[in-house]
Amino acid sequence: KGPFGAIAGVLAIIAGVVHMVGSSFYLVDPWKRSLWIGLTVFWIGLLLYVRIVKPLFMLRRPYRVAEVRKERGDTTTLVMQPDGHPGFRFRSGQFGWLTVWGSPFKITGHPFSFSSSAAAADGRVEMTIRNLGDFTSGIPKVPVGQRVYLDGPYGAFTIGNPADMHVLIAGGIGVTPMMSMIRT
């Protein structure tokens, strides 16, 4: 953990590349050289996107907790309002990654389904979260006004044609995507 893990990871990658170039077994043929260069560029690009580009985008589009609503049982709904931007559009049944404490660069987000209507014009987003672990036990203590970061939307558990008849069966906290479908 911490900077030691990042430094060790970078050193391991450098050692692997030096070994690969030094042994030359994987770089003898032009197609092998092209393959390894392409794979290296792809993975470095993906790493830069996940660790730098995506968090920068999230940092520029924060949300503020507008309401912390206690629900039945050990369940809490976080109502979040876009802070200085219009928010994002999602479809009922989708989810997002929520980062409450800390920077989006730490990649400490947790996935939760949206429970609010996807048709909300003001960009408000609700997530209904049940206390099931270390992170979720702190959700009821989140202060109103707290800056949070959302990454999403993700997922394909959506209703195709809303005019069609649908039967939705769910129980427990698994009902949250259906709440969004019903509210939309």
Can you describe what each PLM-predicted range is?
Residues 53, 57-149, 166:
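Ferredoxin-reductase
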